[in-house]
């Protein structure tokens, strides 16, 4: 449990209030661990196979070690004593915390992949939205500035940050102005943002990102492409062409670059997530 954090505690249950669904076969969600806390009485707890057969039975009380239920593990409370008092607590990995607790979209996978190699320092989340990347990085100890044009999104970010006791600089900002405030940053992050800008401002926006990156600092960009083999199905104001993003970073150390297929959370008329190529770049300034 060292790498897990609690994101939700259920109310105290008694024999009368123990929810019926927990007495039937069910499983935890993807990325969710669960643990019972027993204050009084005892519970017969069954781990189940997918076909409903019992794989293990344990008798739990206030003094016995309580097993952690793994994600998607089938189980049920088979029996509870009349004097039972207990509650359930849910855990997740740190990168899933804000998604689980506040309903956020998960921290972008490229941010998660890049973070271990980037030292703590000043981070600019350019086009932060509600802060799925900002909050995660701030929780790890980065000094985060979040800029976005959408004021309601920034307000939600500030509210969640306040609830979590996180300190972030949050300001409204029009990225197309290409006039980043706040001096130099050690890491500038822009995930799924640039395709919402007009094509004519892209060179200035990228140059502005680069000029506000400290020596030895990093830029991470993920943005939509439209290619011959995979025309973008969304009418974004801008999409990168093959090799275009990479050309902007001539002279930088390219730590990662690809034009792989990816998906939006947005779906088509059949409920399938929209799939096309994204330009993904992680580069270090010399």
Regions found by a protein language model. Name each.
Residues 70-93:
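Ligand-binding loop in jelly-roll beta-barrel domains
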Residues 187-201:
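A short SAM/SAH-binding and catalytic strip from SAM-dependent methyltransferases
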Residues 50-71:
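Short acidic-glycine-tyrosine-enriched beta hairpin
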Residues 92-118, 124, 129-168, 172-180, ...:
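Class I (Rossmann-like) S-adenosyl-L-methionine-dependent methyltransferase catalytic domain
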Residues 34-44:
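Short, conserved beta-strand element in jelly-roll/cupin
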Residues 203-215:
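A short glycine-rich, Lys/Arg-flanked "PGG" loop and its adjoining helix->strand segment in the class I
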Residues 11-31:
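Conserved short histidine dyad/triad with adjacent acidic residue
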Residues 180-188:
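A short acidic, Gly/Pro-enriched loop at the edge of an enzyme's catalytic core
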């Amino acid at each position: 449990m060292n790498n897990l954090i609690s994101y939700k505690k259920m109310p105290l249950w008694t024999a009368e209030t123990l929810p019926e669904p927990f007495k039937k076969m069910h499983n935890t969600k993807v990325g969710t661990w669960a643990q019972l806390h027993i204050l009084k009485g005892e519970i017969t707890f069954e781990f189940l196979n997918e076909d409903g057969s019992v794989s293990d039975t344990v008798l739990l009380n206030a003094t016995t070690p309580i097993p952690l239920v793994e994600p998607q593990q089938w189980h049920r409370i088979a029996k509870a004593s009349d004097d039972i008092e207990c509650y359930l607590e849910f855990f997740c990995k740190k990168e899933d915390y804000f998604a689980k607790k506040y309903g956020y979209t998960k921290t972008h996978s490229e941010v998660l992949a890049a973070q271990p190699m980037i030292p703590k320092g000043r981070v600019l989340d350019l086009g932060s939205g509600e802060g799925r990347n900002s909050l995660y990085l701030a929780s790890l100890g980065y000094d985060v500035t979040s800029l976005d044009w959408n004021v309601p999104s920034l307000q939600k970010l500030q509210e969640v940050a306040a609830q979590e006791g996180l300190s972030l600089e949050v300001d409204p900002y029009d990225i197309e102005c290409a006039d980043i405030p706040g001096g130099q940053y050690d890491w500038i992050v822009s995930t799924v943002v640039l395709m919402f800008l007009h094509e004519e401002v892209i060179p200035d926006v990228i140059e502005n990102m680069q000029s506000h990156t400290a020596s030895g600092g990093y830029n991470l960009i993920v943005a939509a492409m439209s290619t011959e083999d995979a025309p973008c199905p969304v009418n974004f104001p801008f999409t990168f062409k093959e090799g275009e993003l990479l050309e902007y970073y001539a002279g930088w150390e390219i730590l990662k670059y690809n034009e792989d297929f990816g998906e939006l959370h947005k779906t088509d008329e059949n409920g399938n997530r929209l799939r096309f190529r994204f330009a993904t770049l992680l580069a270090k300034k010399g």
